[in-house]
């Protein structure tokens, strides 16, 4: 009896899956950095526009304060602490030149905070200014006045200025001991002051400037002179990772 082979219905044909060995690939050291790069081009452009806008606003602040050089001390210090001083190099240089020109005229004026801040900014930028301006804060016995201890912002400013001493400046050597002793005592009672001192030390150490800038952002928003635009600029500048991605994408 002949056997007839009948083709199986199409619905009855079962395709067996083709099994392949799974390769055990190690994760890329680059992660997904390049996967998102195209989307970041627009973001980078938008961020650049915002940075330029914020820089323009801050330039207006320099212009408004130009009539009184002492009013520029605080903005310059804030800009440097926030790590965005390179955006305003010409404005800062011009302002410090004016401040230096009147340095002798205000030799005996100002409170501890402003005298120390003026001294620190000028000396840090290479001006040869005398530390004799701090003699006015000593008593008849040659010691720093005890009344200064309650001026914490002034003491912190003085502490930072003392780090810019040169060999043989006994006034500043004594100032460093004086401020360190009293600030350590006060910081034990104030977490904010402790944070400010830590930020100051980090900023004095060149290798930790960016870390100091990040820490100061949280301090700055509570300052009386707080500028929302300046803080935005600092945050954008700190978080600007798009440029780093672009540099990586250029690697052959």
Swiss-Prot record:
Gene Ontology molecular-function annotations: terpene synthase activity
Sequence similarity: Belongs to the terpene synthase family. Tpsa subfamily.
Species name: Fragaria ananassa (Strawberry)
Miscellaneous note of the record: When compared with the genomic sequence of the wild strawberry, an insertion of two tandem cytosine nucleotides in the middle of the coding region caused a frameshift that was followed directly by a stop codon, leading to the potential production of a shorter, probably non-functional protein.
Sorted UniProt keywords: Lyase
Gene Ontology terms: biological process: terpenoid biosynthetic process
Alphabetical list of SUPFAM superfamilies matching this protein: Terpenoid cyclases/Protein prenyltransferases
Xref: Gene3D superfamilies: Terpene synthase, N-terminal domain
Origin superkingdom: Eukaryota
Protein name: Putative pinene synthase
One Pfam family cited in the UniProt record for this chain: Terpene_synth
Record bears the keyword Hydrolase: no
InterPro entries: Terpene_synth_N, Terpene_synth_N_sf, Terpene_synthase-like, Terpenoid_cyclase/PrenylTrfase
